[in-house]
Amino acid sequence: MVYKFERKDIKVNKYYFTSESVTEGHPDKLCDYIADSILDECLKQDKFSRTAIEVFAYNNTIEVVGQVTSNAQIEIEKIVREKVKEIGYDDEYTGMNYKNCEININITKQSPDIALGVDVGGAGDQGIMFGYACNETDNYMPYAINLAHKLANRLAIVRKEKIIPYIRPDGKTQVTVEYVEGKPKRIETVLISTQHLAEINIEKLREDVKKEVIDAVIDSNM
């Protein structure tokens, strides 16, 4: 009697997941921070304030537009300059300077139709967000986004503490993680982009960012 054995390859459930994080100087984050700060000041003075604020940043210019209905007396231009300065946009090399940036403000009161709708049905135009806790990290965040946030935070630290003195506020980090059977196996890719002085050699930038940012955050075993 002859027995025939056939080998069947076991398929491994493998996939890649990418997450990104931006630094405080990224235009999206800058604009969000300004809008949030205006809202905070309104609510500090009048808890019944209603705001719908949009902020745009480009070419040393900040645009603040939208609708505000509030009894609060706020200085929007002052808030904008304070936040731009706080983030670190303080010279011509960054493309934005709190000292001389142009600030255009076009704020009106909330339209009666929208006000009535809010009175009757509550705030509209809301997004639906979802999330979950997981056991991949100590803070229950997914591994990829946790690393991306840590890299972005480290990028901000080395700028503010002048460990890498020539980088500027705008930056982004991206991490791709390989998962096997639903668990992080290894880091596939780490990408970091950062604003910097024009005269800096790209090789010097890569060397400094790898040493002071990536190596300070990423586990070499991954």
Residue ranges and their predicted role:
Residues 23, 27-31, 73, 140, ...:
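Alpha-helix N-cap/helix-initiation motif
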Residues 52-70:
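Short, charge-patterned binding micro-sites
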Residues 70-84:
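Active-site-surrounding "flap" and adjacent substrate/cofactor-binding loops of secreted or lumenal enzymes
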